[in-house]
């Protein structure tokens, strides 16, 4: 299935810090058995310890896999960090960078997020660069200003880099809260992101929505012209719900 400008729809699951070997095995088996990727391009971003399990379970399928973070450095004395070339060795295609939980809980700066995106690209991975505003910023009328600020160092990487990325709009106030931006609210921001990319192959860059996407609201969100799929949190941990989103 394709979206506006023939951008292929993409649905990515972000497992966050959930799962165990037994639960993962059951979930991955259900996804593979359903041939979920027939509906659209799909992937799951899993905790680092489960990359080998995920790769083994999905190898040869149409479903990709990836990680939830990456170091800005290729190697070195960076205890606890995981480098992009390491992720590539596990067959990762995707890696999330700049998720709101990383920005908030680990004080990741806009520049660090861009540096991580660059490191991912250099290793042949596709970074999924997350941007979004808090409830306070939205209510203060600062949504677009915040997102433009977050995007600035990413756009500075240039057009050739940008067309190899995916962007994800995740309104912080809608993550894990049960609240969801209306399709019209989400489209407004996605359209503004597309405007910010003007001159940088804006029509080629996929922009996902990532704020409490569920089977019940996926179709209305994905019907918007500038929403190219979803970055799915909790719903990606339930095979039936994740597949419903993919089929929306």
Swiss-Prot record:
One GO molecular-function entry: triose-phosphate isomerase activity
Catalytic activity: D-glyceraldehyde 3-phosphate = dihydroxyacetone phosphate
Keywords, in A-Z order: Cytoplasm, Gluconeogenesis, Glycolysis, Isomerase
E.C. numbers: 5.3.1.1
Family statement drawn from the similarity comment of this UniProt entry: Belongs to the triosephosphate isomerase family.
Role of this protein: Involved in the gluconeogenesis. Catalyzes stereospecifically the conversion of dihydroxyacetone phosphate (DHAP) to D-glyceraldehyde-3-phosphate (G3P).
UniProt enzyme class: isomerase
NCBIfam families in the cross-refs: tim
Binding locations of substrate: 14-16, 176, 212, 233-234
Catalytic residues (UniProt): 99, 170
Name assigned to this protein: Triosephosphate isomerase
Pathway: Carbohydrate biosynthesis; gluconeogenesis; Carbohydrate degradation; glycolysis; D-glyceraldehyde 3-phosphate from glycerone phosphate: step 1/1
Quaternary structure (record): Homodimer.
Record's subcellular location: Cytoplasm
GO CC, alphabetical: cytosol
Provenance organism: Bordetella pertussis (strain Tohama I / ATCC BAA-589 / NCTC 13251)
Major localization listed first in the record, in broad terms: cytoplasm
Keyword Cytoplasm among record annotations: yes
UniProt record, GO biological process: gluconeogenesis; glyceraldehyde-3-phosphate biosynthetic process; glycerol catabolic process; glycolytic process
């Amino acid at each position: 299935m394709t979206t506006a400008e023939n951008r292929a729809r993409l649905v990515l699951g972000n497992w966050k810090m959930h799962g165990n070997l037994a639960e993962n095995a059951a979930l991955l088996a259900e996804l593979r058995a359903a041939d979920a990727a027939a509906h659209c391009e799909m992937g799951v971003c899993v905790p680092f310890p489960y990359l080998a399990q995920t790769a083994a379970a999905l190898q040869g399928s149409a479903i990709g896999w990836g990680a939830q973070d990456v170091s800005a450095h290729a190697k070195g004395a960076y205890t606890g960090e995981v480098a992009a070339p390491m992720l590539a060795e596990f067959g990762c295609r995707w890696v999330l960078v700049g998720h709101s939980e990383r920005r908030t809980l680990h004080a990741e700066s806009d520049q660090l997020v861009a540096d991580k995106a660059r490191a991912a690209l250099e290793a042949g991975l596709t970074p999924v660069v997350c941007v979004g505003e808090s409830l306070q910023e939205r209510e203060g009328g600062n949504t677009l200003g915040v997102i433009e600020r977050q995007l600035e160092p990413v756009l500075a990487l240039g057009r050739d880099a940008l067309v190899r990325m995916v962007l994800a709009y995740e309104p912080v106030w809608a993550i894990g809260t049960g609240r969801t931006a209306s399709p019209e609210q989400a489209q407004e921001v996605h359209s503004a992101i597309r405007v910010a990319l003007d001159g940088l192959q804006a029509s080629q860059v996929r922009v996902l929505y990532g704020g409490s996407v569920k089977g019940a609201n996926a179709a209305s969100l994905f019907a918007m012209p500038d929403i190219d799929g979803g970055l799915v949190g909790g719903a990606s941990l339930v095979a039936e719900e994740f597949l419903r989103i993919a089929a929306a």
